[in-house]
């Protein structure tokens, strides 16, 4: 799961190309594929790592199998602007991209992109930031690759409850209640809301009483989380026993704030993240955070490429694990230590 690999689905898809020699559904043999990718923010650590692996995997596939098909990938940064992203998709379509992959800026505003792609008959793979189900049903060439946000919240909550029950030092004031703060991704963002809601409800379902001291929206960003955590430390100080962060970058922002405040690491609250980014795993290894929930960026990147390749070649999608013909979801993994393959 954590090491680079070529998925069985990808191999099956490419072997089908070799066996059949088929081109796309239009009848002409495909000799090149152009994939356009728009990310909501290139500085988002998880998204950046996922796209890096997407490119690496595409190169691995091209080098390891004689497909007689060249793959070109154009990556655009929407810089947190839906208008910019819409214009980027327009450019990709005008430039002749065969497949569009979109990491939506605003999950509630995909219609412009969908309409443009449908007019050009170019399939769209949305990824990581899940659009509303009804929008994905607007056309039969729309797909989503990602994970189920609630699963990460449940796993984060399970880790928090387990730590509280098994580490007496986690209950710093000894009152039998886990006092916590939340670092939330975005205001009114479905994934952020779901991760927080399920994390907290899971802790209480595990029989651990909690008290919410405060929360801050830090937009998935480490620097913003540093600022927000510093403010929360000023207000609540050592009352904070648990930091529930919607992603690793914000968890690391909390770490930065603790260091800036000169607080000894032994006195830090329990800090938990989500994503299992490279920097997040490094912080887990050295004990700065107590746990993270691994969001399989490698698996998602590979599945997205497999899907894009098969769509562009007009190949069957049977081996790709699509749910309802639309969704590919990779499972999360709970991590309280770094796996050996990441050492």
PLM feature spans:
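Short, low-complexity disordered leader/linker segments with a strong preference
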Residues: 1-34, 65-66, 93, 115-120, ...
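Hydrophobic alpha-helical segments within soluble ligand-binding/sensing domains
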Residues: 29, 85, 143-176, 225-226, ...
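Hinge/cleft segment of the Venus flytrap/periplasmic-binding protein
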Residues: 31, 176-187, 191, 202, ...
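Extracytoplasmic "Venus flytrap"
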Residues: 34-61, 74-87, 97, 103-108, ...
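Short, solvent-exposed amphipathic alpha-helices that sit
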Residues: 46-65, 152-156, 190-209, 224, ...
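Short beta-strand elements in bilobed, periplasmic/extracellular small-molecule ligand-binding domains
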Residues: 61-78, 179-182, 204-222
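Hydrophobic alpha-helical
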Residues: 90, 99-119, 124, 199, ...
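Flexible loop/hinge segments that line or gate small-molecule binding clefts
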Residues: 113-151, 170-177, 277-285
């Amino acid at each position: 799961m954590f090491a680079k690999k070529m998925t069985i689905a990808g191999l099956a898809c490419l072997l089908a190309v070799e066996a059949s020699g088929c081109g796309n559904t239009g009848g002409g043999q495909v000799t090149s594929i152009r994939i356009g990718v728009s990310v909501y923010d290139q500085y988002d650590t998880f998204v950046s790592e996922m796209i890096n692996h997407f490119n690496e995997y595409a190169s691995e596939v091209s080098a390891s199998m004689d497909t007689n098909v060249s793959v070109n990938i154009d990556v655009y940064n929407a810089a947190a602007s839906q208008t910019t992203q819409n214009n980027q998709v327009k450019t990709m379509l005008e430039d002749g991209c065969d497949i569009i992959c979109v990491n939506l800026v605003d999950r509630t505003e995909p219609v412009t992109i969908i309409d443009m792609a449908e007019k050009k008959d170019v399939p769209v793979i949305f990824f990581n930031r899940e659009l509303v189900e009804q929008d994905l049903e607007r056309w039969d060439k729309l797909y989503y690759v990602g994970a189920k946000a609630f699963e990460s919240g449940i796993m984060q909550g399970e880790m928090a409850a387990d730590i509280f029950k098994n580490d007496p030092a986690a209950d710093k004031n000894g009152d039998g209640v886990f006092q916590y703060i939340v670092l939330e991704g975005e205001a009114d963002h479905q994934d952020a809301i779901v991760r927080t809601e399920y994390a907290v409800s899971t802790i209480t379902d595990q029989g651990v009483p909690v008290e919410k001291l405060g929360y801050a929206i830090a937009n998935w960003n480490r620097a913003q989380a540093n600022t927000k955590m510093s403010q929360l430390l000023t207000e609540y100080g050592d009352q904070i026993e648990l930091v529930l962060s919607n992603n690793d970058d914000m968890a690391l922002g909390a770490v930065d704030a603790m260091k800036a405040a000169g607080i000894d690491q032994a006195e830090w609250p329990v800090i938990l993240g989500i994503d299992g980014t490279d920097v997040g795993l490094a912080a887990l290894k050295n004990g700065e955070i107590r746990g993270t929930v691994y969001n399989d960026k490698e698996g998602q990147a590979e599945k997205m490429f497999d899907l894009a390749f098969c769509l562009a070649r007009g190949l069957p999608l049977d081996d790709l694990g699509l749910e309802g013909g639309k969704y590919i979801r990779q499972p999360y993994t709970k991590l309280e230590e770094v796996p050996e393959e990441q050492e």
